[in-house]
């Protein structure tokens, strides 16, 4: 788990507003978008893609421990250089995730910030994606995996 704090550490906020990334800030699912892009680039085999689909179903139906499922879902990155994953995350962010940000989500963020809230992304998405979303939407902090 990674926590990134803004530089605005000395300002007292009245409350904290948490936002999930997938299907809350965006109309996309970051893991699905990453898996699709990784498959197209040859970073994810047919077998691993099929396994990810099965794990996704198990996750949604709560057929297995949620944390174990999440760990299994991201196991495909093992052995891939971190730079390659970061580049893939940046590509997916720019081409899929950021363009799918809900306009209402932007309004909600602005509303909370106007009311002196600390705005935080709380997500199981990759750190690179959460960080880029926070920077582009003027979000104060992230808590992500």
Task: Go through the PLM ranges and name each one.
Residues 24, 98, 119-120:
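A generic secondary-structure micro-motif detector
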Residues 19-20, 92-94, 114-116:
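A short, structure-level motif marking secondary-structure boundaries and short turns
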């Amino acid at each position: 788990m990674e926590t990134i704090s803004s530089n605005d550490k000395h300002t007292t906020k009245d409350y904290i507003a948490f936002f999930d990334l997938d299907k809350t800030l965006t109309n996309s699912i970051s893991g699905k978008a990453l898996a699709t892009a990784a498959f197209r680039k040859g970073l994810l085999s047919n077998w691993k893609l099929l396994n990810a689909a099965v794990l996704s179903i198990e996750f949604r139906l709560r057929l297995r421990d949620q944390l174990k499922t999440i760990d299994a879902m991201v196991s495909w990155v093992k052995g891939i250089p971190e730079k390659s994953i970061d580049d893939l995350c940046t590509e997916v962010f720019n081409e899929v995730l950021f363009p799918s940000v809900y306009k209402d989500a932007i309004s909600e963020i602005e509303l909370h910030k106007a009311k002196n809230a600390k705005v935080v992304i709380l997500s199981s998405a990759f750190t690179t994606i959460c960080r880029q979303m926070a920077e582009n939407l003027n979000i104060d902090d992230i808590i992500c995996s």
